[in-house]
C-alpha cells in the first residue's frame, strides 16, 4: 500500500508528515491529510530544509503557547506558592511549584533545580535570577552557589544546612549569621 493507505488506517497520528513523491497528482490528497509539506522528487535540499524549519516553528509555537498560558495563570495567581515555574528540558516542558524545590545550585551560567521527589532540572537562568524570583517565597542564599527552600531545612550541622531529604549543603562563613537569623525568625 501507499503512505496514504497507512495514514488512512491509522485514523489519527501523533506526528507530522512530509510526503516525498515523484508524482504531482497526489498533492491534493496530501493536503487532505494535513501534510506538513509535499516534496517532489528529486528532493531539493533547500526545500527539505524549509519543511524542517516549518516543523520546528510549528512545535516551538506550541511550547511557547503553553509557556504563555502558564505565565498568564501565574499573573492571576494570588497564592504565590501555587505559582508554577516553567522548565524546558529537550522537547519536554515541566511546570513545578516553588514548594516542590528543595534547593538550587549554580553551575556556571546554568542552575540546577532539585525537587523533593528527587528530580533534577537544568535551567539556562542564573542562580541570581532564581534568587530574585524565589527569595520572596522563602528561599535563602546560603552560599554563593546555593539557594535553599527554608521550609526544607530541618537543622544546622557543622556549617551545613540539612534538608528533609537528608541533603547536606554547605553554608558559607559570610552567610552563617544571615542564615541563623532567617531560620530563627
Task: Please describe what each predicted stretch is.
Residues 172-185:
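Short, basic/aromatic-enriched C-terminal tail that caps enzymatic domains
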Residues 8, 32, 131, 180-181:
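A cross-family signal for key residues in well-ordered alpha-helices
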Residues 1-71:
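CheY-like receiver
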Residues 12-13, 136, 185:
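Short, well-ordered coil loops that connect the C-terminus of an alpha-helix to the N-terminus
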Residues 53-170:
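Conserved binding/recognition cores within well-folded domains
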Amino acid at each position: 500500500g501507499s503512505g496514504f493507505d497507512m495514514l488512512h488506517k491509522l485514523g489519527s497520528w501523533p506526528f507530522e508528515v512530509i510526503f516525498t513523491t515523484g508524482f504531482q497528482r497526489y498533492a491534493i490528497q496530501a493536503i487532505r491529510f494535513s501534510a506538513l509539506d509535499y516534496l517532489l522528487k528529486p528532493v531539493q535540499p533547500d526545500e527539505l530544509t524549509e519543511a524542517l524549519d516549518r516543523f520546528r516553528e510549528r512545535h516551538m509555537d506550541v511550547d511557547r503557547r503553553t509557556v504563555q498560558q502558564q505565565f498568564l495563570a501565574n499573573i492571576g495567581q494570588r497564592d504565590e506558592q501555587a505559582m508554577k515555574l516553567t522548565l524546558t528540558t529537550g522537547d519536554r516542558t515541566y511546570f513545578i511549584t516553588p514548594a516542590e524545590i528543595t534547593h538550587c545550585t549554580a553551575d556556571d551560567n546554568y542552575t540546577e533545580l532539585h525537587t523533593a521527589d528527587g528530580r533534577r532540572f537544568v535551567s539556562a537562568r542564573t542562580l541570581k535570577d532564581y534568587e530574585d524570583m524565589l527569595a520572596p517565597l522563602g528561599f535563602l542564599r546560603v552560599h554563593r552557589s546555593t539557594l535553599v527552600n527554608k521550609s526544607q531545612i530541618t537543622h544546622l550541622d557543622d556549617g551545613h544546612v540539612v534538608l528533609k531529604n537528608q541533603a547536606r549543603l554547605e553554608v558559607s562563613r559570610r552567610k552563617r549569621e544571615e542564615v541563623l537569623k532567617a531560620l530563627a525568625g
